[in-house]
Amino acid sequence: MEVSAVLRGVHLSPQKARLVADLVRGKKVDQALNILAFTPKKGAEVIKKVVESAIANAEHNEGADIDELKVTSIYVDKGLVLKRIRARAKGRAGRIIKPTCHITVTVGN
């Protein structure tokens, strides 16, 4: 039994989110939540929210026992890239790139 949760359009670089995702891949869910609670990165609280959602889905939809669940897979895909312009000196313009990502977490036995 595997249950997943997806969070799309997170205002976070996929590269930065993958650093945090690698910390919890393959861990038991209680251990993963503990790691995420004490990781001082923005991506940690976002991924913690998705892991909690996947746990709630498993408990509600499948009636799974939380103590036996582990993070079977977690991956971060590149999302939409917002491009903005910042005015610079002498009539020039600088490009601002605001990356987003999609986070998918799968929990199972």
From Swiss-Prot:
High-level lineage: Bacteria, Pseudomonadati, Pseudomonadota, Betaproteobacteria, Nitrosomonadales
The keyword rRNA-binding is assigned to this record: yes
GO cellular component: cytosolic large ribosomal subunit
GO terms for MF: rRNA binding; structural constituent of ribosome
NCBIfam families to which the protein is assigned, alphabetical: rplV_bact (TIGR01044)
Function: This protein binds specifically to 23S rRNA; its binding is stimulated by other ribosomal proteins, e.g. L4, L17, and L20. It is important during the early stages of 50S assembly. It makes multiple contacts with different domains of the 23S rRNA in the assembled 50S subunit and ribosome.
Key words, A-Z: Ribonucleoprotein, Ribosomal protein, RNA-binding, rRNA-binding
HAMAP family given in the database record: Ribosomal_uL22_B
Name of the protein in question: Large ribosomal subunit protein uL22
Subunit structure of this chain's protein: Part of the 50S ribosomal subunit.
Record-linked Pfam families: Ribosomal_L22
Recorded family membership: Belongs to the universal ribosomal protein uL22 family.
GO process annotations (BP): translation
